[in-house]
Amino acid sequence: MKSLLKILPLFTLLFFSCQKEYETLGPKEELLQQIAQLNQEIEAFEQMAQKNASNKQLQQSFEKSRLTYKKIEWAVEYFTPEPARFINGPALDELEVEENKFLNPSGFQVIEELIYPTFSTKEKAALQREIAVLKGLIMQVKEHVSAITISPDYVVDAVKMQMYRIITLGITGFDSPISNNSIPEAQASLLALPSVIEKLHQEPSQIQNSLLDRIRKAAAFCNSAKDFNSFDRALFIKNYLNPISKNLQEFQQHYKIANVAKTNAILQTASSLFGSKVFNVDAFIPSQEYAYTSAKAQLGKELFYDTSFSKEGTRSCASCHNPELAFTDGLKTNLSLNGSQLLRNTPTLTYAGLQNAQFWDMRQTDLEKQSLDVIQNKDEMHGNIRDNINNISSNPSYQKLIQKAFPKSKKLEEWQLQNALASYVRSLNKFNSKFDQHFTEPATELSEEEQLGFNVFAGKGKCATCHFIPLFNGTVPPAYKKTEQEVIGTPQIKNGKKIDPDLGRYAQYKMPQLLHAFKTPTLRNAALTAPYMHNGAFESLEEVVVFYNEGGGAGTGITVDNQTLPSDKLNLTDKEQKALVAFMKTLTDSK
């Protein structure tokens, strides 16, 4: 706790220091009032904890505080992201692997674990301690908001991000994993937005009225939820949330509100979270000179099939990444150059450019480093990019491609070959699956079974709390600045009772939380990428669903002391499991 409280005052206002000054707006005053209200409710919750209130009273007070927080989440997450991750982040240690240290979790989700399903008086001291930390975090938010100027462009951008947050986290149970109060909380978030938007302009318009009407109708639809599991998320997103995002874009254009000048994973021009023109691959590059161009990708495509990168000239990138199998190889694990089994399953390269870590063990941060790692690996290619530069530069079939890709360069350099290969991989994001078309093209509809599968995925199955919509990987929305790993207890063999011995991220960082931890991969094109898991233990999607339904490794009887996947059974019916598989098959890109 001390380490957490020490770092909080270090958060600065640098992000806003160079911005144009605007007259202070109404949203700021309202926001400060709501922060004060939240603080009062947390203090009331604290008093209940001190007075040995009943379990029901504690939970009701907690839920009241959560609903108030959700009203200001749009601003807290946007303007104070560092405190926000401790206010409402997962109840897991916050790892800082480069420094080999971690921060204990805090905030609402830690408190939720203490009081749900029932509160034990043995946890009274822990509860009071966590409430004190939460109050300190709220104070940090108040001080920060008091010091900044909130201008219309930031408000609109923050509201956009909140809409994406509701879709990807808010309605999936990500931050309400035990109480399952996600739908009322999403409703609270929505109901807070009209007041914020109305304060941006003194001149209402039909566009503004339409936007506010859609938001209120979306909030009203939340009342249709009988419970967390039965809520129709597919309908909610398509008919309510996506149109709000589109209206927000129209509202911004009508009032000539500028875009915020920043490099974001979601393009400023995106009118929803779904489609082929939403994500910015340049948000995941090492620096601006690595920016994507189609010319680089074309050069990279030729290099991808070039066997000269391997020492013996027998293997190219395509040898293990077959386009017909979504750039995998269909093997449990591939073979090394000497014919022995490699340690891990070959992952898909589709959508690999939209994550902040590469390889199962996340040992490289970007695709440029990934390509170099593979080429130099003695078991995989055993090549040397430097030695190959002259051969490629002098090859007539490459010369025009090189000139188009890097027109300002006098000679080809190593980083450019890496960048070209990476650019080709960054071009493999089609976003044209049946799932994508369902949310972008009125004429395309998921079947009843597929929609049930999506609702299970984003609801009862809790799949979307790790495989985030719409990338379905572990890159955390809506900022997409962090890619997560999980410990799920994958067995050494199917139906086995021993965990696979692969150390995962622990091999690079000797932190107990990372033992057997692996990156959360994308599920896009999963129907083409069998077998599954880092070791290829499962042969079908059906087997994977059964494994998760049982609670992962710990749920099946494997000893996994640090499993991050809840070990409780999901209790999915046969119909739900079948529907879940049917849904995952809709994530296959069209050719």
Residue ranges and their predicted role:
Residues 2-10:
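Sec-dependent signal peptide recognition
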Residues 13, 18-23, 217-296, 382, ...:
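Post-cleavage N-terminal segment of exported redox proteins
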Residues 22-278:
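Mature extracytoplasmic or organellar-lumen-exposed domains after removal of signal/transit peptides
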Residues 43, 47-50, 63-77, 116, ...:
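Sec-exported extracytoplasmic/periplasmic mature domains
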Residues 88-149, 153-154, 306-310, 315-316, ...:
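Extracytoplasmic redox metalloprotein regions
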Residues 212, 542-570, 577:
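Active-site pocket scaffolds in enzymes
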Residues 266-373, 438-539, 543-546, 552-559:
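Short glycine/threonine-rich turn/loop motifs
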Residues 516-529, 534, 570-577, 581-590:
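C-terminal substrate/ligand-recognition segments
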